[in-house]
């Protein structure tokens, strides 16, 4: 419909699928910012509590969408009092520089969000990064971020991942 033009396509189609499966209206809240890093969606305390990561790199964001805690404060906290039954997440492209920390950061993010909503079992589903044609070092780091996403899956209960390797459009970073 025309009313969803600015809404996340992934979020819209996921919500539509839920509606068809459940047969009841489904409300969706979108909190997204293109090109953001995972650290921006976390508190500084959660980053500090994440073991084994390069904390200096994790806290080195300089743009609004990469500054630790900026998007958590501005886009997560304002909606955390709403009833929610789960999360979907499609992010990671901007963490190619610190792919080696992505698994630990994603595990910590899920823990933080579940604590924020007061439900340690809230489902968390996410999308594998698409096979986009990056260049140079970022081309080499893409499969490493994807591997980190799958390794995180093994440590996050009540979670799932949507594979995108079969989409076959290397010129579109977010294929629909």
Model-inferred region functions:
Residues 1-176:
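Cell-envelope and extracellular/periplasmic
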